[in-house]
């Protein structure tokens, strides 16, 4: 860590829970962010600002006018430009001292597994069930911690899932690929709510990477109308085809 790093990250380094050792861990880490929408853009901003050494930014979509209500990395001038490339450009302006890789593709199959294998933490910021399930399966197979979130209306949810998966995985809670009846396309979403959830994904990633204990194995639910939180304990499903031990299928 050089003098420039010390000055840039000085407000984090002052924290006993992070200090120089924790900051160096962040600088040496790689985070894969899949989905650069309402969740992924605030998460990416805070992780870049915090000095995570390598951010891999994956999204196959372009910026649309309807995104601008909540996807805070983008401006009107970015409409029809690839989200991954715009994100890389904006984050470089924020922190030119980190490595930023743009993947303008929908990660799936071997490409997904390769990206997960190189990451220290994966942030699932996607918006469809099939993709979430595939990300979860890859993370479990490769023992990569997964931080997943979603938001619709005034509500959000967050999970931190870590090896050895004693509290289960995403499929334990949602055992099939059926899409929820309500999503932001059909029911809408309040921008700050999805921002809260994406920011918390960044916070949990910083904690994991710097060695701060974090409560894993909980489904945390946020009600934006009442500003209330509640947590539900997760339990591994004995017959889970992803994390269920001898019952698990190979990925």
UniProtKB/Swiss-Prot annotation:
InterPro entries the record matches: Adenyl_ThiF (IPR012731), ThiF/MoeB/HesA (IPR045886), ThiF_NAD_FAD-bd (IPR000594), Ubiquitin-activating_enz (IPR035985)
Q: Which reaction does it catalyse?
A: [ThiS sulfur-carrier protein]-C-terminal Gly-Gly + ATP + H(+) = [ThiS sulfur-carrier protein]-C-terminal Gly-Gly-AMP + diphosphate
Q: Which cofactor does it need?
A: Zn(2+)
> What does the cofactor field's note say?
Binds 1 zinc ion per subunit.
Q: Which residues of this protein are catalytic?
A: 184
Pathway(s) this gene product operates in, as recorded in its UniProt entry: Cofactor biosynthesis; thiamine diphosphate biosynthesis
Which positions in this protein are listed as binding Zn(2+)? 169, 172, 240, 243
SUPFAM superfamilies xref list: Activating enzymes of the ubiquitin-like proteins
List cellular component terms (GO): adenylyltransferase complex; cytoplasm; cytosol; sulfurtransferase complex
Look up the EC number in the record and give it.
2.7.7.73
BP-aspect Gene Ontology terms: thiamine biosynthetic process; thiamine diphosphate biosynthetic process; thiazole biosynthetic process
Q: Which residues take part in binding ATP? A: 11, 38, 59, 70, 83, 107, 127-131
- Extract one GO molecular function annotation from the record: ubiquitin-like modifier activating enzyme activity
Which keywords belong to this entry?
Answer: ATP-binding, Metal-binding, Nucleotide-binding, Nucleotidyltransferase, Thiamine biosynthesis, Thioester bond, Transferase, Zinc
Location in chain, cross-link Glycyl cysteine dithioester (Cys-Gly) (interchain with G-Cter in ThiS): 184
Task: State the superkingdom.
Answer: Bacteria
Top enzyme category: transferase
PANTHER family, per database record: SULFUR CARRIER PROTEIN THIS ADENYLYLTRANSFERASE, UBIQUITIN-ACTIVATING ENZYME E1
Self-association or partners: how does it assemble?
Homodimer.
Q: Which family does it belong to?
A: Belongs to the HesA/MoeB/ThiF family.
Q: What does this protein do?
A: Catalyzes the adenylation by ATP of the carboxyl group of the C-terminal glycine of sulfur carrier protein ThiS.
Q: Which NCBIfam families match?
A: adenyl_thiF, PRK05690.1
Q: What's the name of the protein?
A: Sulfur carrier protein ThiS adenylyltransferase
Species annotation: Escherichia coli (strain K12)
């Amino acid at each position: 860590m050089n003098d420039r790093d010390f000055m840039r990250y000085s407000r984090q380094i002052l924290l006993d829970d992070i200090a120089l050792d924790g900051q160096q861990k962040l600088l040496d880490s790689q985070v894969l962010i899949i989905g650069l929408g309402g969740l992924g853009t605030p998460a990416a901003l805070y992780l870049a600002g915090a000095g995570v050494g390598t951010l891999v930014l994956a999204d196959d979509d372009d910026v649309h006018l309807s995104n601008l209500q909540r996807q805070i990395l983008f401006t009107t001038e970015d409409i029809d430009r690839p989200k991954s490339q715009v994100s890389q450009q904006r984050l470089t302006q924020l922190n030119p001292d980190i490595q930023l890789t743009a993947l303008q593709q929908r990660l799936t199959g071997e490409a997904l597994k390769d990206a997960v294998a190189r990451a220290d933490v994966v942030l699932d910021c996607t918006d469809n069930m099939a993709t979430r399930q595939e990300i979860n399966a890859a993370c479990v197979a490769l023992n990569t911690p997964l931080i997943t979130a979603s938001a619709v209306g005034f509500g959000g949810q967050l999970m931190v899932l870590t090896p050895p998966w004693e509290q289960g995985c995403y499929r334990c809670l949602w055992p099939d690929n059926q899409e929820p009846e309500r999503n932001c396309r059909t029911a809408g979403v309040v921008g700050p709510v999805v921002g809260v959830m994406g920011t918390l994904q960044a916070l949990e990633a910083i904690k994991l990477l710097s060695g701060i204990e974090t409560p894993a194995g909980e489904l945390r639910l946020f009600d934006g109308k009442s500003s209330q939180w509640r947590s539900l304990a997760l339990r591994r499903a004995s017959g889970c085809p992803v994390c269920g031990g001898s019952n698990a299928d190979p990925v």
